[in-house]
């Protein structure tokens, strides 16, 4: 039985910091971001199914979101303004991501590859699955901006405005629900979110 470096690589996602060009009150790494995106994507899928007649697999969407940035362990986290500076750079970066995704898939033992390839290679995502993961990814970036701004870090003011436009372009009923029910709490202190539920 040959060894695989797959999970050793994924473990290093925690070493890759997001928002590398910006001053952060609290640094966020790709590993913790991926977990939050997985939780939010699962919630969006569950809301879609329960409230708006959707029929998506919420558990699969959570897994897709968990692995959505896995290729960054090989490429690093390129800052968004650089990644989307123009269409040519965006297209080339997509090609690099695809190569990195395939390299990760190739690390998985043959007998497990059919399980992990559909999670890592985004070409296996349906349009609806991809849409929900992208919504969750943008929402989590927006939540990071709210947290930084609440801590007095105005460095994230323009990013918040840019993400509001992104969220508007990806708007859905389930996102509106999430924004109304869950997002306001992210601007409150621990005391404020704890006062209704004493231990």
UniProtKB/Swiss-Prot annotation:
According to its UniProt record, this protein's enzyme class is hydrolase
Disulfide linkage: none
User: Does the keyword DNA repair belong to this entry?
Assistant: no
Known catalytic reactions: a 2'-deoxyribonucleoside 5'-phosphate + H2O = a 2'-deoxyribonucleoside + phosphate
Site entry (Appears to be important in orienting the phosphate for catalysis), positions: 18
- Detail which positions bind a divalent metal cation: 33, 68-69, 137
Location in or out of the cell: Cytoplasm
Q: Which Gene3D superfamilies match?
A: Hypothetical protein af1432
Q: Which cofactor does this sequence's record say it needs?
A: a divalent metal cation
Q: Give the enzyme's EC designation.
A: 3.1.3.89
InterPro entries from the entry?
HD/PDEase_dom, HD_domain, YfbR, YfbR/HDDC2
Can you tell me which residues bind substrate? 18-19, 33, 69, 77-80, 137
Its quaternary structure? Homodimer.
Give the record's family classification. Belongs to the 5DNU family.
Q: Which NCBIfam families match?
A: PRK03826.1 (NF003009)
Reported function: Catalyzes the strictly specific dephosphorylation of 2'-deoxyribonucleoside 5'-monophosphates.
- The name of this protein is 5'-deoxynucleotidase KPN78578_26370
Q: Which organism is it from?
A: Klebsiella pneumoniae subsp. pneumoniae (strain ATCC 700721 / MGH 78578)
**Organism taxonomic ancestry:** Bacteria, Pseudomonadati, Pseudomonadota, Gammaproteobacteria, Enterobacterales
């Amino acid at each position: 039985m040959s060894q695989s470096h797959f999970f050793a690589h994924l473990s290093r996602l925690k070493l890759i910091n997001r928002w590398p060009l910006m001053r952060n009150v609290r640094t966020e790494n790709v590993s913790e971001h991926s977990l939050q995106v997985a939780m939010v994507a699962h919630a969006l899928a569950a809301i879609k199914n329960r409230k708006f007649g959707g029929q998506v697999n919420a558990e699969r969407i959570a897994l897709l979101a968990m692995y959505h940035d896995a290729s960054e362990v090989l490429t690093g986290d390129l800052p968004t303004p650089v990644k989307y500076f123009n269409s040519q750079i965006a297209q080339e970066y997509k090609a690099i991501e695809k190569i990195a995704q395939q390299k990760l898939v190739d690390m998985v033992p043959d007998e497990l590859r059919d399980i992990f390839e559909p999670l890592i290679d985004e070409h296996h995502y349906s349009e609806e699955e991809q849409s929900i993961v992208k919504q969750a990814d943008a929402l989590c970036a927006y939540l990071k901006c709210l947290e930084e701004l609440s801590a007095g870090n105005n460095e994230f003011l323009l990013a918040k405005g840019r993400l509001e436009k992104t969220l508007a372009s990806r708007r859905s009923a389930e996102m509106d629900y999430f924004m109304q029910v869950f997002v306001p709490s992210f601007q409150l202190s621990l005391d404020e979110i704890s006062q209704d539920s004493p231990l």
